[in-house]
Amino acid sequence: MHTTRSSGASTSLTTPGRLLCALAGVLLAWLPQSGLCQQGSSLPNLEPFDKAVLEVMRKHDIPGASLAVAKDGRLLLAKGYGYADKDKQEAMTPQTLTRMGSINKTLTAVMVLKLAEDGKLKLDDPVLPLFEKAGIAPASPADPRAKDIRIRHLLQHSGGFDRERSGDPFFQPRLREIARRQGVSPVSCDAIIRDSLQEKLDFTPGERFAYSNTGYCMLGRVVEIVSGESYRAFSSREFLQPVIGKGFQAASSTESRPGETKYYPFPGEPLQRGAPGVSNANVPSPYGSYSVENMDALGAWIATPTEVLKFFLAIDGTRGKRLLNDESLRAMRSEPVLAKEGNPRAFYGAGIHVVRSDKGDNWWHTGSQPGLQTLALRTRQGYAWVVAFNSRPEHAERRAFFKDIDQALWGAANAVKEWPQGDLFANNP
């Protein structure tokens, strides 16, 4: 580990807490061409990753980012770039907490697969009887096909819910419609399940893929019903505490937690109507336009990229306590059998995206909510990285934004001439 200023190399400082970018002369490394500070630690030869993140931030006007990079289970880089809070000039650090968005879904999938591994459920069990037993399901679902929704369908986003057709119940305007129909405020995950089952499905379960927050809300309740514990308690005790040394931390809809970054709407974004039961005012989109509290199984997790990286490396035992056995890993990375899609080489397995090749699999998940974009990736070459940004562009530019992130980090990995030895995990708890 080395310290060099104005060269793209990082400092060796790993003190927890927020630091002022104004103290750069003492504490932070600067890239003069970008004007952005960076703080954290890395082993030699990884400057291409600094350049990659800073270029994405500059191109898309992102205030802050945090990155953790590993190879073969060893942490090689943990850094923050730019600002966690621009107004206060507080630097993003490796210890800065960020919302992880839909990366949370991978945690939920691992929990479900472990319950199946332990004989507590079967992936082809129907979910409706569980919800009926728990008093969540309506007395008579509107669509008879609801009885055919299986746990496996929900894991693979083929449960019959398509937000492109019927809207996403976790965001407005459908969130507000559910509050009115169900007579609840704020809108809970249980209310969303009940309302979804009182509507016609968008397609027959198992027919095709359609990314669905509703499905993972349902899986969170399956975990609670089968385990007999709350989602947060079960995830903390069985999965997070043994791997990252602390339990599930949940975001707040209306403010950042202590040690958490501030989130920024895209430049020029107007204020949004507050979500039912969250805010009666017009608000910046990251703070009150939706309810994070009802997303525990699909997008409420706050953590550092290093912590999420530890979790991803533990799934197959590359580092730390192994979370899933071989059979569960095969289920996680198996192609879904979908009537209209055949067997593609790129697909969504159970809680992860997979690209299959003759040399092995790459698997990952992304997260995107107002004010944030995240990516967690494992590759067949042994590389792994988790990155979080505290803003995202307007809707029309988001696909290009993610493409730029993905290409920049792959380009950085390919530009490393010699991967260093050593492991920084001990310095980055």
Task: Please describe what each predicted stretch is.
Residues 85, 139-362:
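Short, surface-exposed loop or secondary-structure junction motifs
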Residues 48, 92, 184-188, 368:
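Short secondary-structure boundary/capping elements
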Residues 58-66, 88-153, 203-214, 296-299:
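Short active-site loop at a secondary-structure junction
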Residues 80, 91, 99, 126-130, ...:
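Conserved beta-strand positions that form and line the central face of beta-propeller blades
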Residues 2-6, 11-92, 98, 114-121, ...:
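N-terminal leader/targeting segments and the immediately adjacent pre-domain N-terminus
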Residues 71, 104, 127, 252-258:
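Short, solvent-exposed turn/loop segments enriched in Gly/Ser/Thr/Pro and often Arg
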Residues 38-79, 224, 236-237, 272-429:
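Catalytic loop of the DD-peptidase/beta-lactamase superfamily, centered on the K-T-G motif
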Residues 44, 48-55, 102, 107-111, ...:
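Extracytoplasmic/secreted proteins, especially bacterial periplasmic and envelope-associated proteins
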